[in-house]
Amino acid sequence: MFIRKNVIKLAIPIMIEQTFVMLLGVFNTMMAGHIGEEAVSAVGMVDSINNIFISVFAALSVGATVVVAQQIGKKDNEKVNETIKQALVSGVILSFTITILMWVFRTGVINLFYGSAEELVKSNAKLYIEFTLFTYPFIATQQIANGILRGCGDVKKPMYVTMFMNIVNVTLGYILIYGIDLNPLGINLQTPSYGITGAAMSIAIARIIGCIIIIRALFKGNEFISMGKIFPFKIDVETQKSIFNIGIPAGVEQLLFNAGKLIVQVFIVTMGTSAIASNAIGMSIASIINVIGNALALSATTLVGQYIGRGDIKGAKSTLLYLTKFATICLFVVGAIFIPIAPWISSMYTQNASVIDISIQLIRSDCLAMVIWPISFVLSAGLKGAGDTRYTMMTAVIGMWIFRIFTGYVLGVVLEFGVLGIWIGMYTDWLVRGTLYCLRLRGTKWLKHKVA
């Protein structure tokens, strides 16, 4: 009962937070879908690029989460506060550097990866990336702050901030994408419609506001956090080493993983605009299906890290096993619900019949594959919480670059199964990685990493 209560107390706020994180992307994709398949294709293409860099920031967040969680387990609050400062400054420097480089090479990047796309799709993609890349520093800062708070067990603040961000994004998104023409009390209210530019503007503003709020919450502190001033800042080599010992392998894993996804996206671009749009819609709906799984994966990182920090090896392993089994049951149920409603939910994104038909195939295949998702992602998150990031990095690289890309290319391009073939390659990757993580869990090497 202790494990169950402990998990539920942490997982429910994270699940609510992840629901709203998911909705942030879903609403943007949905609203872009009603502009046209060119717009939703552009959003999906740019998100594939953005996710490469966002994954780097997420890796820093994982490093901060694990180090803070283990320091909390040791009741070393002084080191917790130093870790927060070091992680935030590193994140800001890294994200500003990436932003500048991406601004310089933005057009070349679009042409390099998506040169075969239709001109209207590419022009929309260039507009969308110009706005979203400027939010990288805000995304990095918010992700690190969220990770730190989760490492402390404070999961409610990220939840509330993400909820508010969604309200801002949906409200501004509707106004900026479609424009309004109202006449309340005889007062004429009109705003122009900005189309895909409006979609980019709304999500950018929401991210900036969310970053400001979460940083303010972090500085207010809690029972573990009492930061004081960041500046004058001095690099603490030992703390940075602890963060990057976790963050670098996690970052390389996510960088190579998302680079692989970008290559897969290039395969899909050659299949035409309908295929690109279907893939974007399918991924958006898959993010809805995965909310519970993502929440339990994030919980695994924090809980395993805290148990390891306390020296409770048995508790770490039993909690990770419980989370994996619980996620499997939950995702099986969610998948069973989404199989019959796939046509209805696809039609919420677009009225294009061919796009809807392909999206239905993708959603239903994803629902069937959900039972193997937890062993690939929840186990991986728990291993990272223990500091076993080098193993998860190598496993993810093997799964992506040998199995997902190769299988996806053969099935999707060579054998002409289309986007569905690409997705079957993704499920093969999940199964291979999950099998390797299960083998790792049976041993004890993953429990022997000293992080904090």
Show which residues each predicted segment covers.
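Residue-level hotspots within pore-lining transmembrane alpha-helices
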Residues: 16, 20, 24, 53, ...
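Helix-terminus/linker motif at the lipid-water interface of multi-pass membrane proteins
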Residues: 23-41, 110-119, 175-179, 184-194, ...
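Short runs within selected transmembrane alpha-helices of multi-pass transporters and secretion channels
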Residues: 61, 131-150, 158-166, 199-214, ...
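N-terminal transmembrane alpha-helices
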Residues: 2-30, 34-35, 51-63, 92-99, ...
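Transmembrane helical elements of multi-pass membrane transporters/channels
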Residues: 9-25, 131, 206-210, 214, ...
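Short alpha-helical transmembrane segments in multi-pass integral membrane proteins
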Residues: 1-14, 68-135, 184-248, 304-369, ...
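Transmembrane alpha-helix boundary and packing residues in multipass membrane permease domains
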Residues: 14, 18, 29-30, 66, ...
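Small-residue-rich hydrophobic transmembrane alpha-helices
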Residues: 40-100, 139-158, 276-342, 373-396
